[in-house]
Amino acid sequence: MIGSARKQKAFFFVMCALGFFAILSSTMSKNPVLKPFATSLGTPNDLLGIVASASTIPGILISLPAASLSDIFGRKKVLLFAAFVFASAPFLYLGVDSWWTLALVRFYHGFATAVFVPVAEASIAEIFPTKRGERISIFNSATAVGRALAPFLGGYILFVTYPSYFSHYVAVGIAGVTAFVIALIFLAEKRNLSQAHYPTGWSASKMFSGWLLLIRNAGILGISFVQAVQYYVFGSVEFFLVGYLTEVVGLDIFSVGIIIGSQIVALIIVRPLIGRVSDRIGRTTPIIAGIIASCFLVGAFPFTTQFPLLLLLAVGYGVSFATVLSSTSPMVCELVPATLVGASMGFLATMMDVGQTLGPIISGVIFATSLQYLGLFFSLSVLLIASIVVFMLSNRKRFNVLEK
């Protein structure tokens, strides 16, 4: 493991830079280009959802296995694999000529984020055991900056070069290759992010037994449920709040952008600050406080049409969302031994993807009822309340596998 403070700082800086370019690249590949590109290929309307969701499937399928393998073979090899996918996938879009080949490329591209994020977080958690909340939060804020810049940069390139998509995906590729070069130069040096924790006689059965320990740990299950609910709600708000602001409130697109953007900015700025606080006071209080605040803020959206209040609610929700996320990842790796740090992060990432995938789908069904936006946002508040109950009950029953 990286030893000196100087090397630790260098590693952390490189991981943030790697995360920025990697997520910038992957987000540019879909926002705002994916829908017009898919439409230009003659994709039927009923298949657009398949193309859009193809990249989320790997997150559900392989985050846990990939992160578990990083526990066994070390983080370096797994991170290099993810960086290679980030670099190679963008250029495959240049050969796409049908909706199904686009879906396949999206599926392949999804492996990059599914592998990279949990393994990177596991590496940071190991290297900064007393500053996990702060460091993981800063890393995630760096990736969030890349995610926030992508639509603007991608939109500008698309505006200048439309109707051609060649230049756009070349730009996506440049960002991906930059991430790969950063990873290759740094990770190729003779420094090990994490030694393999399993003995030489490792077998698949031992990895599966580790997974069994995770799902038997009440604390892990409680935190994972909270994470799933947080992204279920976030995915739903991200999609349906725009509709509420335009259809019900009657705001123009620019005003909508200010409200949605302020939520993201609040998330980016506040998350590291709350992460530092959680390192000092513990994880439980920020998680519960953040969920309670989210419950009231989300539930209040359909009761106002005033721009200043909607802006305040959006900023408040961004802060409360950041408050919860700043503590979930650090807490989950503190409940497991060193052999399962990666696996615990992978399990958390899997639950996150499940929540973010199901959120818009189930919320869409609720929205289709006569209650529409009122029923939708109320259902999100109820689910947040349920997550508090589950978390508090699991907090009482949890046991630390380190003591077993």
Residue ranges and their predicted role:
Residues T56-L64, R147-A148, I264-P272, Q356-T357:
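Residue-level signature of mid-helix packing/kink "hotspots" within the transmembrane helices
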Residues W100-Y108, P308-G316:
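Paired small-residue
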Residues V105-A144, M331:
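Cytoplasmic helix-loop-helix junction between adjacent transmembrane helices
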Residues Q8-G49, T56, G222, Y231-L245:
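Helix-loop boundary and gating motifs at the non-cytosolic
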